[in-house]
Structures are given as C-alpha cells and as structure tokens.
C-alpha cells in the first residue's frame, strides 16, 4: 500500500478488503484520507466495506460529509451500508447511526436540482437496503420519479426488500405505465411484498396481459401475497391455456405456469377446488412429478386428494419408494408435497389423519433401501440425493422420535444427508444430540466436502452450553480454514472467547504455475461459448477482475466438467444456476476457491460464482436475468453474457449444458 505506483496501491487495497482482516483498516484509512489518486481512495473505501469492521467508520463518515470526488463518496456510502449490516447486536446503536448517515446522504442527493451523482444514488440505495435505516421509505420513494430507469429499478428493489409502502401510489402507476419491464416487475414485487390490496386489479391485469414474462411472473407472485382468492379463476384459466401447448418447448410459459400453480396453492389452501385439482393432476404428468411447485400446491389445496393419488397405505408406501428409486428428483418433489401437509393449520378438516398418512409415506421413503424393490437402470440413480428433502419434510411433523431419526442419519455415507441431519438437530438441544454431534464431528472434518462439519459446528453453537463449546474448540485445529473460521465465529457469538488468532492462513491449492497461467490472461479476450438444450450463449470472462475464478472456470470447462449438468435452479427475473454435479444445489468439484470480490456490478447478464458462505465457491455459477444490486460486493462477478442472453431467458429448470468451449485470443477484451 506504500508503493509509488497507484495501480499497485489500488490492487493492494482490494487484496486487503478481500482478506477482510481488521488489522488492515488503519492502512486503508490512510489511503482513503490522503492518497493523491482518486481510484486508490475509492478502492480503499470499497475495501473498508468488505472488511466489515467498525474501526473505519469514523473515517468513512468524514468522507461522505466532506467535499470529495463523487466516486470516493459513493464507495464510502456503500461501505457504511455493508458495515452496518454486519455489526453484531451489541453494536446496534452504532449500526443505526451508520444507517442514518446513509439515509442522509441519499436525502442530499435527492435534493440536488442539477447533476446528482448516479453512482452515489445507486450505491446509496443498496446501502440503505443493507443498513435498514428508520424512516427510509419516503426518501427512497423520491427516486421512483427519476428519468433513469436503472434508478427507478433499484429504488423499487430496495422498497420491495424492505417491505416499505411509501412509494406505493406511484408504483401502482409505474406498474401499468412504465416503459421499462424491470421497473414494472419490481413495482409488482413491492405491491406484493407490502400487500397493497388496492393494487389487486392492476396486478391481475399485468399478470394476464403484460407483454413481458418477467412482469407477468412478478405480478402473479404478488397476487399470491395479497391472498385475494378473486384472482384464482382468472389465473386458472390462464394456466389452462398455457398448459395446452407443449411446455417443454415454451420456456417462458413453463415458468409462468409454475408460478400460477404456486399462487393458486396459496390462494386456495384447503378449498378442495375441483377444477384446480384437475389442472394440477395434468401438470403432475407433464412434469413427471418433478415440479415441487405443483406438488406443494396440490397438497395445500386438498391434502386428502393429494394423498389419494398414491392409493391405500400399503400401495402408497410401495409407490413412493418406487418413485424415489427410479428418480430422486421426483422423490424430492414428493417429499416437499408431503412436508407441506405437516404445516397444515388447525382449521383443516381431518388434519391429524392427513398428517399421519403423510408422515407414514415420508418414513417409507426414508426406508427405501429396505423396500425389497429391485430397480434395474443403466445409469446411477442416486436416490440418496432426495433424502435431505425427506428429512426436512419429516421435521415439519415434530414427531417425538425425530431426534432419534436424525441421529441415525449422521452415519450415512452421503455428506449432504449428514449435513441436513446435523442442521435439523440444532433445533433439538439435548444431551443425546450433543453426544451424537460430537461423535460425528471427527469424521465430518475428514470429508472431502465440509458441509457436514460446518453444519455440526452451527448446531453445537445453538446449544450454547460449555460442553458444546468445548467440542467446537476441536475445530480450531482443522486444516480447513473455513472450519477454523466457523469455530471462531460461533465461539465468539457464544461468549466463549475470541480465538481469532487461530484462524491463521489459508493452505492454498494453487501452485506458482497456476498463478502464472491465471495472470497471463489479463488483457486477453477470454470467452466461454456455452451450448445448452435451449441454444448457445457466450460469456466474456473477466480475468482482470477475478483471475483465479476465471482460471478455475476455464480449467473445469476445458476438461468437460460441465457437460451434461442441469440448470438445477431457475428463478424468473433473478437467476439461472448450474455447475452442480449432483444436480440438487449441494455439489461441487471437491475443493473450494477464494472469493475475488470486485467492483463489477450485478447488472443484467452478470455471471457470478455461487456460494454457501465466504470463500466457498467451486463449480456452481449463475447468470442474472435483471440487476441484482444486493449481490454486489458479496459474490464474485467473473463474466458477462455478451451474446445469446435471449437463450438464458428461455432456460428452465432441468435444461442441460451440452458443452462449454473456451476461446482465448491476445486481442484485448472490450471494456464494459
């Protein structure tokens, strides 16, 4: 940070922020306050936000209240939002002060009659989303009237995530009249999140008639939040029309149909509506039981009819076991449907009977290995992949022997089953469960994947007992820095001591050759042509912003790692996600890579590394359908889709990557 070269100082500041060590804050503060280069000062502010340390907040507050270049001020506001969100409960007063400062900065920008700073507004809106300052609604709502559609988009996004009603009158107008579809979609999100009853007619109109699928889906979802059953008939008619065509060839309609099913399940809970049930039966066949939205909606509307689909008890047990043995994805979806019955309100007729029947079927699924069924297939079925969802569903019934059932799963070979069992045991504190978690931890710490070990540490932490804390301390000696970090975090939260010095350094898996190869791409054009069952799209990778993440992706693609993987997660108007060898969202390449957080924003078409926590990336990646500013500074952006984004928009859950071809050239990639 003391180099004579400004680019080196800037990169050093970024590195300090990525590491996140509080000890770097004094040096970052010096750069923020005194460096002669604006880019260095801006990066210092960004890095201080990534450190999430309160130690630098006075300097950041001084910056936003002084005359500094716009980018420096914007990054300081962004940093205050990140720090406010990360402060522990005992520093709640300070967090409120930081949130108030963010809001005051936004108020100042909204009052400028000429030349407001766009970056300050956008980063300030996201900072407000994170800091959650009191009385933020009226200030944020001011930005709904700006000419810049991206500002309107982000203002609505912040109001939606904070569930603030202050802009609802204007949002009702934007819902029907704004020319930008993402503004309309986000307007629908706010009106749904705040349960704006007067918006019913406008939302129903957009759900049925908007020319953009993202708006229709957001409006359908919002109608579910309004809980107004008047929407059911119109939505069902729309769903019937859409389902008459081959949904496998009509992606936008598929996502729309699934959202309609989900919303009807919310609007018609326990209504036993025959027409809706008939439609859902057809959808179950269309999706071959592999749409959880359909299974859950069916179970909500008529638990009796849903259970009847499987026959009497003996044949039903055999049927669900057979489905699980043939197709784990279908088994997972059935489990989610049965789990919904476990959450039925007291008012549902024959609730106890239905819950007993559903629980019996879940236990049969859990016991699938003893079914006596012999299924011959040419490919590995991996029925065990459905068991985590079976366990979560079973937990909803709160059976007396749930602890015993979960403890028995701690000896399973599948690490995700053990992780799920450990996680659920965290809500069942008892001496027997503590002993079981203690016995399971040594094995989990030797796993290739650390999911089970992390879950065990979390569950032990919830018990907040001296005995549990002593067990957690054993992870301080782990070779995995993520386990050491988790142990330190849990022990500190439990008041059992500050062992931060035990985190130590990371044992990197990268060699000198790896670093040289990754750095050699900086300045080159590196593209990934992703061929899917819906067509190809091209990603411009960003080696200058995230060299190691790009190198990891390139190495995996070059060896054909992604070929045949399914897009296991598709959330309309949010993301599509792939890269999981298991296909259930829990898999990876058997190692983890460090985050390379950067200033590239999550605009539409951004390509990011999926995580389950800091530095947990591996092979799962996602593409954003629309701007997602809440992801900025939390997930590594390592590319952008530069061609074929219309293909990404057509992708639905279950679509497949055929191949990824990497194209490198010495031509410098164009700046975005």
Which residues make up each language-model segment?
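Alpha-helix N-cap/helix-start positions at coil->helix boundaries
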Residues: 6-7, 22, 37-39, 54, ...
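Alpha-solenoid helical repeat scaffolds
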Residues: 11, 27, 43, 59, ...
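Alpha-helical, heptad-rich or low-complexity scaffold/stalk segments
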Residues: 2-31, 35-50, 62, 423-424, ...
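Structural signature of alpha-helical solenoid repeat scaffolds
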Residues: 17, 49, 81, 122, ...
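Amphipathic alpha-helical scaffolding segments comprising HEAT/armadillo-like alpha-solenoid repeats
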Residues: 1-2, 21-33, 53-65, 86-112, ...
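Solenoidal tandem-repeat scaffolds enriched in leucines and small polar residues
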Residues: 72-74, 82-139, 148-153, 160, ...
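Cyclophilin-like peptidyl-prolyl cis-trans isomerases
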Residues: 408, 412-416, 427, 431-672
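Stable alpha-helical elements in mature extracytoplasmic
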Residues: 8, 24, 40, 56, ...
